Amino acid sequence: MAQLWGGRFTKETDQLVYKFNASISFDQRFYEQDIKGSMAHVTMLAQQGILTDAEKETIITGLQGILDDVKSGKLEITDKYEDIHSFVEANLIDRVGDAGKKLHTGRSRNDQVALDMKLYIRDEVQETDTLIKEMLEAILGIMENNLETYMPGFTHLQKAQPITLAHHMGAYFEMFKRDHERMKDIYARMNTCPLGSGALAGTTYPLDRAYTAKLLGFDGPTMNSMDGVSDRDYLIEYLSALSMIMMHLSRFSEDVIIWNSNEYKFVEIDDAYSTGSSIMPQKKNPDIAELVRGKTGRVYAALTGLLVTMKGIPLAYNKDMQEDKELPFDAIDTTKGCLQLFAGMLRTMTFKNDRMEESAKHGFTNATDAADYLVNHGVPFRDAHGIVGQLVLLCLDKKIPLDDLPLEEYKKISPVFEEDIYEAISLKTCVEKRNTTGAPGVKPMQEAVDSYKKYMEEY
């Protein structure tokens, strides 16, 4: 067992206690952040005259060697060590001798792990944002090519009004655009350096915390040492943002699953993103979309778990906070994997434009426009609503759409109707008349696409 403590103890740690307490099995993914943080720390110590330049160079050379050897696989991280910090320090001492024992001067594992976590999450926020960009690019590509691809819009999973595929995809662009903005917001707020906070009360050494923060790319040091070591707000915010991403992906998945069904046939998922059945030869299942929908719960669980962990912890650091890693790591890996797969599925998906347009022609998606026709001819909307409701009932009885109802039948219910009612309720007219900002008409949708393209150029 390699530990960084033990001088005041008279007994060896019980093996079960050691295993229960150890975190090396999961915090080893911090190895790069831990080493980079240590390099910045010793650089600052040398600048402040706490270490000599020779000691600094010796330690940094040793740390770089550990980093290179771990990356190449030459050096393995094992459960011989309690955590990633003890792994790095023990290996450093083995390589450079007594100079390595000075690495931890002016530092506690409390501010060290707080730094490691911030560096790691900062990297993950950027990686997540890159994957969000890929989603946005995939969605925008579909929008550009489908400004006049008509389809039904739904409320309560029932056909409601005609829209376009571009309009439907634009809703998801807006969702993931907000996810991108959340990533920027999280990064800006979390970008302060906790190193130098010590265990909770700083240190007596003349550290230059601003210099360390600058070396590591932070905007500055944290301004309260107790908060510096015990803050996990940024991680909770990140998990909340990941939960939002997964919620958006889950809703998108539900649409894809429905559209892919034989009852809808709006899309065909590429073979590379589908699976079959072990017993039913005809099956082509939307498993990626279903798994994304299913995995959303585990990301929510990570957020809820950390909130529950943190809610009762007094200041400052407590061992409970070791539980800020395993579930969040899983949530990060899950969300990134789902984003990557979903973008690939979208890019290779075939949209059945004719099928979508045919579906939009049925289900009385033009009923609102029939009511608007009456309003434009002086009928109060509430009366127009009732008149069209009667027309729908008549068409249901005759098993025909409004477009096929003879004019004399229209006139029996309201004499206001004339021959131009058919043009007014045509699919193209229904969509094109909706030309205000954010509506599905070609003009507002082209404006949206142009705006989104500019947004992506500045991403």
Region locations from a protein language model:
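A helix-coil-helix interface module used to build multimeric assemblies
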Residues: M1-G202, L207-A213, T275-G276, D287, ...
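Glycine-rich cofactor/substrate-binding loops
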Residues: A2-G37, D98-A99, M280-Y459
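Short runs of predominantly hydrophobic/aromatic residues within well-ordered alpha helices
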Residues: S38, H85, E89, L235-Y238, ...
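Conserved hydrophobic residue
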Residues: I50-L51, L75, Y264-K265, P380, ...
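A generic structural-conservation signal
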Residues: A54-E55, P152, T222, D383, ...
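Charged, flexible cofactor/metal-binding loops and thiol motifs
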Residues: R122, D129, E144, P152, ...
